[in-house]
Amino acid sequence: MPALRSRTTTHGRNMAGARALWRATGMTDDDFGKPIVAVANSFTEFVPGHVHLRNLGSLVAGAVAEAGGVAREFNTIAVDDGIAMGHGGMLYSLPSRELIADSVEYMVNAHCADALVCISNCDKITPGMLLAALRLNIPTVFVSGGAMESGNAVISGGTARSRLDLITAMSAAVNPDVSDGDLSTIERSACPTCGSCSGMFTANSMNCLTEAIGLSLPGNGSTLATAAARRELFVEAGRLVVDLARRYYEKDDEAVLPRSIATAAAFRNAFAVDVAMGGSTNTVLHLLAAAVEAGVDVTLADIDQISRTVPCLCKVAPSSTRYYMEDVHRAGGIPAILGELDRAGLLDPDPHTVHSASLREFLDRWDVRGPSPSPDAIELFHAAPGGVRTIEPFSSTNRWDTLDTDARDGCIRSVEHAYSAEGGLAVLFGNLAVEGAVVKTAGVDEGQWTFRGPALVVESQEEAVDAILTGRVKAGNVIIVRYEGPRGGPGMQEMLYPTAFLKGRGLGPKCALITDGRFSGGSSGLSIGHVSPEAAHGGTIALVRDGDIIEIDIPARRLELVVSDEELASRRAALEAAGGYRPTGRERPVSMALRAYAAMATSASTGAARDVGLLGG
């Protein structure tokens, strides 16, 4: 039976100094011997998805104490990708994932904590904490801050825009048909509450996937930040983590540990949910990195196989203007998606979770479309938006009159009525992406699933934006944005502004954008990212020239540069003779912190996970 890790600092004559310091934090003799639970909060006033988390660590801590544990809270950093977007700040977004993972590891191991509650929410915070949890492998429960309500506005002439979000504002900003007054109205209405942005963007996608993989409670992915029902998730997380700690340290039950939960089967289930719900392409990056920490062998080819067999059951903003996270919740949330996949035989029902002995047991209680959902499930998924601008969590007691259980035309469809027979994410291969590239097919009109056009090559996101706004980009172009990968950026920027500006200029359905960088979860259209190898690693994307023909075939999973092997070899030799794989004419300050990240960054095809072996020695 494993001893409490915290005994290292709380027991023995030689630890008198450590105990003295623990006492200075408020601990007493009675606390030495209880499991110490690290509460990793991510409160910050910079991020709407985290602005309401200030007091929620105390809520968890109170529940931990009532259950017989001792909670100690600390904070991590949290970058707002939307505010960091479109300028040099975006270089820091993906690297912050590694800093968050490291900071959680540092705090937990430095203080010998026994268990962990991760209070996360937005884009890189949930993934960073997930990497840490799998690395530490101590009893852990995730609870996120919850989704933002969708916006609404009345613009000129009384025209109502009933559903708005951040992307609406970005696209409207470059649409010449939108007046300054209307733009101001949209801007002020797009993000009405605290919480992670209201669509199936990266933050909400990842919070849904912690639920699918089994490390958070039912409803974690879809319950709104403003919903009173969300409060119980924080309280239950505190109770549950103490129970998990007792099972491990007192009963030697290793089944409660993150790596025992996030098994290969659990990862396959999570990827099935991901492609079924049309999650952000960033989820592929983050789950691949998490698999590395979990010691699970998952490749892009595996994900591609899942995407070919699992249909798209759910289209939420930005893939649809009809549905937002509040609608996913009303339709039963992640348990409903899992249930539809389970009934179609597309899931492994055996993996257990932090709260249930198996996925099947989980669904028996929490799938509102199943034969006998629990009263708790029915109550939870009735939680509705408040419709009031606020940054207060749990402020809405509104309830939907009915649940959306329409499997034919509702927010979450059955396999028989799927949006498409294949999933909402796809992996493409070809001479332009030998190791793979990722596209969110749920956000691409089927008329664009095959596309052929001349390349317009730019060496940075900034140049791409300039090309769009100055009219260099024409209908039919395939925009190639290169040297924006994990090393080449460095930091693998998101291309939300280029995709939003294409949409705003009416070019979204008429162009394609291909990059070795990333796309925001808010991006839609024919946006192909994570091209691997990246340009800075000698990938074929470095050899593309203006006017080269690019062929995209999503059904065939193909991404090709229509240039002969002989010509490509000639171009490669010339490029290497000229000094190698570096952007031309780009001036970009790169700090020491970013250089350190670049030195250890691996390919997007392996989740851009760090490899210290790249440092040598």
UniProtKB/Swiss-Prot annotation:
<keyword id="KW-0456">Lyase</keyword>
<comment type="function">
    <text>Functions in the biosynthesis of branched-chain amino acids. Catalyzes the dehydration of (2R,3R)-2,3-dihydroxy-3-methylpentanoate (2,3-dihydroxy-3-methylvalerate) into 2-oxo-3-methylpentanoate (2-oxo-3-methylvalerate) and of (2R)-2,3-dihydroxy-3-methylbutanoate (2,3-dihydroxyisovalerate) into 2-oxo-3-methylbutanoate (2-oxoisovalerate), the penultimate precursor to L-isoleucine and L-valine, respectively.</text>
</comment>
<dbReference type="GO" id="GO:0051537">
    <property type="term" value="F:2 iron, 2 sulfur cluster binding"/>
</dbReference>
<dbReference type="InterPro" id="IPR037237">
    <property type="entry name" value="IlvD/EDD_N"/>
</dbReference>
<comment type="pathway">
    <text>Amino-acid biosynthesis; L-valine biosynthesis; L-valine from pyruvate: step 3/4.</text>
</comment>
<keyword id="KW-0411">Iron-sulfur</keyword>
<dbReference type="GO" id="GO:0009099">
    <property type="term" value="P:L-valine biosynthetic process"/>
</dbReference>
<dbReference type="InterPro" id="IPR020558">
    <property type="entry name" value="DiOHA_6PGluconate_deHydtase_CS"/>
</dbReference>
<dbReference type="InterPro" id="IPR042096">
    <property type="entry name" value="Dihydro-acid_dehy_C"/>
</dbReference>
<dbReference type="InterPro" id="IPR004404">
    <property type="entry name" value="DihydroxyA_deHydtase"/>
</dbReference>
<feature type="binding site">
    <location>
        <position position="81"/>
    </location>
    <ligand>
        <name>Mg(2+)</name>
    </ligand>
</feature>
<dbReference type="GO" id="GO:0005829">
    <property type="term" value="C:cytosol"/>
</dbReference>
<feature type="active site" description="Proton acceptor">
    <location>
        <position position="520"/>
    </location>
</feature>
<dbReference type="Pfam" id="PF24877">
    <property type="entry name" value="ILV_EDD_C"/>
</dbReference>
<protein>
    <recommendedName>
        <fullName>Dihydroxy-acid dehydratase</fullName>
        <ecNumber>4.2.1.9</ecNumber>
    </recommendedName>
</protein>
<feature type="binding site">
    <location>
        <position position="197"/>
    </location>
    <ligand>
        <name>[2Fe-2S] cluster</name>
    </ligand>
</feature>
<feature type="binding site">
    <location>
        <position position="494"/>
    </location>
    <ligand>
        <name>Mg(2+)</name>
    </ligand>
</feature>
<feature type="binding site">
    <location>
        <position position="122"/>
    </location>
    <ligand>
        <name>[2Fe-2S] cluster</name>
    </ligand>
</feature>
<dbReference type="Pfam" id="PF00920">
    <property type="entry name" value="ILVD_EDD_N"/>
</dbReference>
<keyword id="KW-0100">Branched-chain amino acid biosynthesis</keyword>
<dbReference type="GO" id="GO:0009097">
    <property type="term" value="P:isoleucine biosynthetic process"/>
</dbReference>
<comment type="subunit">
    <text>Homodimer.</text>
</comment>
<feature type="modified residue" description="N6-carboxylysine">
    <location>
        <position position="124"/>
    </location>
</feature>
<dbReference type="GO" id="GO:0004160">
    <property type="term" value="F:dihydroxy-acid dehydratase activity"/>
</dbReference>
<comment type="pathway">
    <text>Amino-acid biosynthesis; L-isoleucine biosynthesis; L-isoleucine from 2-oxobutanoate: step 3/4.</text>
</comment>
<keyword id="KW-0460">Magnesium</keyword>
<keyword id="KW-0028">Amino-acid biosynthesis</keyword>
<keyword id="KW-0479">Metal-binding</keyword>
<dbReference type="InterPro" id="IPR056740">
    <property type="entry name" value="ILV_EDD_C"/>
</dbReference>
<dbReference type="InterPro" id="IPR000581">
    <property type="entry name" value="ILV_EDD_N"/>
</dbReference>
<feature type="binding site" description="via carbamate group">
    <location>
        <position position="124"/>
    </location>
    <ligand>
        <name>Mg(2+)</name>
    </ligand>
</feature>
<keyword id="KW-0408">Iron</keyword>
<comment type="similarity">
    <text>Belongs to the IlvD/Edd family.</text>
</comment>
<feature type="binding site">
    <location>
        <position position="123"/>
    </location>
    <ligand>
        <name>Mg(2+)</name>
    </ligand>
</feature>
<keyword id="KW-0001">2Fe-2S</keyword>
<dbReference type="GO" id="GO:0000287">
    <property type="term" value="F:magnesium ion binding"/>
</dbReference>
